[in-house]
Amino acid sequence: MPIDAAPITDLRALARQWPRTGRLEAIVLRPARGQAAVEVATTEAIAGRGLQGDRTGDKARTSPLGGKRQVTLLQAEHLPLIAAFAGTAQPAATQLRRNLVVSGLNLLAARSPFADQTVHLHLGDEVVLELTGPCDPCSKMEALLGPGGYNAMRGHGGLTARVLRSGRLRVGDAVWACVAAEPAPQTTDQAG
């Protein structure tokens, strides 16, 4: 016998609701390729570029929107899962080299399932990001997490984003998602 349930009448309305606000748990900067990542308490997000002090944010951009991988984000709740799948201790945020670690807000749900409904991620009082895609793990995860480390991170490697509005980021900032008032600008950037 089927369970009575209210029908879903407006999936778009459901996709606009989040149960709670998240929190920025860590800010990680990667000064240069091959250099150790560093955790900081605050940094500046620069529209169309990335984070000040990070190798992607310090690069000059030719497109006004910049590339699609200006900032990388990781779900804090995925850290213990990655460790469990790899059979290792929980890795530090700096080891995984993702710029922003967020807890309490499902980052995957902050990507709209509808092409004509853009969702923006707000961090603190100023910064606005647009999530642009998955941040797949690289082969360095094998060395970090051991054999199978790459596969331990698959599906949990985080997301990439572009900075739409500049501002100061601080560990502890509130993070929330909302549907944009108008669609985000489109780009034909191929470097992304």
Annotate each predicted stretch with a short phrase.
Residues M1-G192:
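Metal-cofactor-dependent catalytic cores
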